[in-house]
Amino acid sequence: GVSSYGTISELPENQYLLQIVFDTDPQKAPKLIELAKSGLQSLADNGPSEDFLSKAKENFLKNIPENHISNNYWNGKLGQFYKYGKDFDTDYEKVVKELTPEKIQKFIKGILGQNNFIEFVMVPKE
C-alpha cells in the first residue's frame, strides 16, 4: 500500500514536510517513485479535481465529532497552543470548507518549487 503524510511547522522556521511511503519489490521502486512524482506534479499543474477535494473535505469534516471526544486530540491541540500560541481547533471546520482546488494547487506549487527532494529506497539485506 501507499501512504502519505504532511506537516507544516513554524519553529524553528517555516517548513513543510511531505512524505510518500510505499512497500514494493526493489525492482519496481523506480516506476512507483516516478508515479508519485508525476502525481504531485499533476497537482501542481492542475490542482485536485472538485470531486476529489470534495471527498477529502467530507472525510476531514466527518472526523471532527470523534476528535472532540478524544483525549489524544486535545492533548495535541494543547501542545500546539503552548508551542505556537495559536488555536488550531476553533476555525478548523471553516478552514477545511474554504479549501479550493486553486489553494491546494498553489500550496503544492510552493512546495515543489523549492526543489528540495530527498529519495530513500531501502532494500533488504542480502
Predicted regions located by residue number:
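M16 family metallopeptidases and their MPP-like homologs
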Residues: 1-45, 50-98, 116-125
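Low-complexity, intrinsically disordered Gly/Pro/Thr-rich segments
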Residues: 101-110
